[in-house]
Every structure is written in C-alpha cells, then in structure tokens.
C-alpha cells in the first residue's frame, strides 16, 4: 500500500504508544538511532521533519526524513526491541511490551499503592492543602471518602496517608484544647471508614425523624389508607397516595395513625368479633383495594364520593390497626392471586350481614348516588371489570376465573333502567340474586326484554342480552 510523499502514515497503535514515551526513560536510555528519531518525528506531537528536537539525529543516514523504504522498516523491526517497533507493522508483538513497560502508570491515579514513585513523606505543599481544608471544616473535620480521594489526587498522596494525617490533626487539636466540633463516642485510632458510616447513620436517623414529622402533618386519604391496610404509606400530601411495596411493613405515619384511631377500637370491637365469626381471615390481596384504590383508579370523577363513602361510613369496613397482619404477603396484586386466594375465602365481611349474602352486596348497598359510575366497582378488584370478561373464555385462559367470580356474584352486568332518569349502578338485589343462584349461576338464562336484571353469563357468544335490546361488545 503506497502513500504520497508528504503523507505521514502511522499505525493506530504507534500513535498511542510512541508519542508519549518518546521523552520517557526507556527512549532516553536507549541509543538514539535514525529509525527511532524518524518514528518520533513523524508522530502526532511533532509532525514536521524539521523540528528542533530531532533535526540532528534525523538528518544522518537519509537524504530526507520522508524517504520511507521497505528495507528500512525491515531493519527497524529486526534491530530494535519489542517496545520500539516499526510504525508500519501491525504491532502484535510490540503492543504488550509497550503497555507493560509504560513508565507513567495509569492515567486516573498516577501513584498506585505499591508504586515506588509516590512520596513517602508529605511535603509542605501537600500539608498546606490539607490544613486549608481542615480550617474550612473546623466544625466537622471528618472528610468523606470522596473528599479523601480528591485530596489524595491533589496532594499526590495515598488514601491511607490522607486519613492518617487527618486523624493526627484531630488528635493534635484535641490535645491543644482547640476542638471546635462535637466529640464522638469512639477512639480516634479506629478506622475513618467506621466514622463515615456512623455519621451517615446519624444523618439517616435525622432524616427519618424529619420524615415522620412531615408525614404526621399529612391529611386526607392517608389516614384512611393506614387505617384500612397494614402496609400502605402516605407518599405525598396532595391526595394522591400510592400503595407501598409489599415487602414493607408499616410506613412512617403508621404509628401516628394508630394513636389517632385508638379511640375507635372500642366501637369496632363488636363488628370485628362479628366479622371473625362470619368470615375466615381476610387475605392480604383484598385489603388495600376495598374503597381506597377504586376511587383513585375510577375513570369517572363522580365515582370518588361513592367509593369514599363506602370506605368511610361503615365502621366495620375498617380493620383495627392493632390486628395482627396475615402470614402470607404476596408481592404483586395480580388477578390470578386474587382469584385463587378468594375462592376459598369468599366473603370479606364488611358488615354483619347473613353468611349467604356475598361480599359484593354490602359496598353496593352503602349508598350509591344517582350520578355515580355507570359500572360498579367490585370490592375485591380495585379496577373496574367493564364488559370484557365474558370473552375471557374465548380468547384467553381466564374461563375458570370468570366462572368462579360470577359464582360469587363479583361480576355483575347491570341493565338499563326502565325510567330514563335512573343511571346504571350496582344494585343490591342483583348481587343477592347472583349470590343465591349458587351453582345455577353458570347456566345461561334468558328473560324477556321487559324483564328486570339480566346477568348474562354465557361466555360462548359474542353479545349479551341487556335491557331492551342487543348490544354487541366487539
């Protein structure tokens, strides 16, 4: 491959390997020959052949420094050691030698731990820098790890030297009674990393106390969330409260909420005893979804007062804060876990109703305003299951889930009211009908269009007979 006369070609390896060590110890110790001078004169930092550093050496033996020949390259490859190779070869052998014999160490931190180049004793400049930092931080003369690294790079000392210097300086100031910082309950001879860890623990405890003070001032839905569930937190104070991770036990405002709701425990004892008699222990998968997440997740803004009234008016819907948490805590609020856990535990027990009445009837009977949501919110499912569930059996594997939820009266398909003034909302009679139906609820029924409530439960068809006509769902 030929290049023009004035083209200074260098391989990519030669630019990185021969430009910097040209003035290093290895290059100065070796005999200065024509090929070494010419490769250095053609480097990136001295591209001109007439540069002052190499004029005397480069002019001998060649008519011009730019007369490149193949025999000169072969002679250079044969006659020089591996770390000073020809700029024309691929540097497969010269690369490792040059990297291992680099006289400057790494670029990030030039003085390594076992490198003999770092200073064993601190100079006046280094101690002046450390003293300046100490004078600026007299109230807290404990540098962090990042500050120690910064000071070590500036003063060209190691981290051990910097830590030892600060420990000695603090001990010296303590002996001279010039302490301007709060003493620590530990000896100064211990490692400084432990001091950093204890200081970070103190800062985290202060932040936790500040967080509890601010979270105690939170108002609105956080009080109801903490009273209803055992592990939900008040994230912000503007009304949008998010549920915690399932692994967290209680959030910061849980203790204050327990204190505030202790006066309600006496009133709730009777309802809680009735709940324990009627219903099995409630699963965790259904606790944060009753009356709390439904108003937050409802698409219509009118559904919020109905869900809020369902969470506020009956005292039985609140579990006492002192109740022991259940043993199983799933990590995800998945639909499958809700279905599998609630099949064996059908009733949540929001009030002292009859055992045959399903859990869906009580939140619906707590009072839905006429302008409420057109679709009822299930107490076990926080999100609205509108009308897509009849087709789960056709397209997905949710057929068993659909049948099970319909058997409990959790999926209700309401009809259009006879009078135009009424709106579509959850009816207790429909819920009780579906609950009393039992095993017959899985059969397909047909009633005349003038009839009342028609729960369409046939999952094999593409439309449901609702009210006065046929409405297609696809």
UniProtKB/Swiss-Prot annotation:
Subcellular location(s) per record: Nucleus
Q: Establish whether keyword DNA-binding is in the entry.
A: yes
InterPro entries in the cross-refs: HD, Homeobox_CS, Homeodomain-like_sf, Iroquois_homeo, KN_HD
Location of the DNA-binding region in this protein: 115-177
One cellular-component annotation, GO: nucleoplasm
Q: Where is the composition biased (Basic and acidic residues)?
A: 196-210
Per the record, the similarity remark reads: Belongs to the TALE/IRO homeobox family.
Report what the protein is called. Answer: Iroquois-class homeodomain protein IRX-2
Organism per entry: Mus musculus (Mouse)
Q: Which gene encodes it?
A: Irx2
